[in-house]
Amino acid sequence: TASAGNHGLSLATGAKIFGAKSIVYVSKNVPNKFIAQLKSLGSKVSIVGNTYDESLKAAVDDSKKNNWILISDSTWEYYDTGLDVMEGYLISISQALQKIKKNPTHIFLQAGVGGLAASFAAYCRKKLGYSPIIIIVEPSFAPCLQHSILKGEPTLVQGPASNMGRLDCKYPSRQAFYSLSRTANAFVSITDKESLKGTLFLSKRGINISQSSSAGFVALKKLIKRGDFLLDSETRALCIFSEGDVR
């Protein structure tokens, strides 16, 4: 598989449990902490390219050439194994909703290729209906879902690498895009500078997470200042912190 971190750890863990071999392709921008964790789980790590998309292409090409089984967290035409990965994400959102006493009025979901966001949004629509406003958050350097919505089809975007490494994806998951086009209310982007500022804000309050993880919260703060999306004193916002500090 190719991964910017978390999916690779999951796959490496599963392979170890079942006695299988795993190879995880990562870009040069993936934190060394992730690479060390992958190796500790027995996975071989191949560092290819500067972005997730470049490492994914290498994983796809080598899988075809070597007749390997590819387990990607993304989907594209004629490949939908990523749907199984998306189904696994449902455990997290179901646990989150169980702990909430009152239903959220707003849900902020960070997105890379969109798999996690799409599965969470679909689950929330099923359980909560269309009352919560669901907002998808992407890096300003990689707003592939936002651009895809504007184009009406999965669309490649160009841009420099973002510090929000797990969200730095230039092309969306096909299935995630079409799902979010029906379940999400809005797509917003945040800059790396805004991301860093928001992450430091949380750190000073004892919440130590990565810039990728804090994206939903950062967008919430940004939109409150702008007075958008009916955010007021009665708002009950749900943000998902999807990983800890990876430095």
Q: What function would you assign to each model-found segment?
A:
Residues 75-78, 111-115, 138-143, 163, ...:
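Glycine-rich beta-alpha junction loops
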Residues 23-106, 149-188:
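Small/polar-residue-rich loop-to-helix segments that shape phosphate-bearing ligand pockets
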Residues 9-19, 121-128, 218-226:
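Alpha-helix C-terminal capping segments
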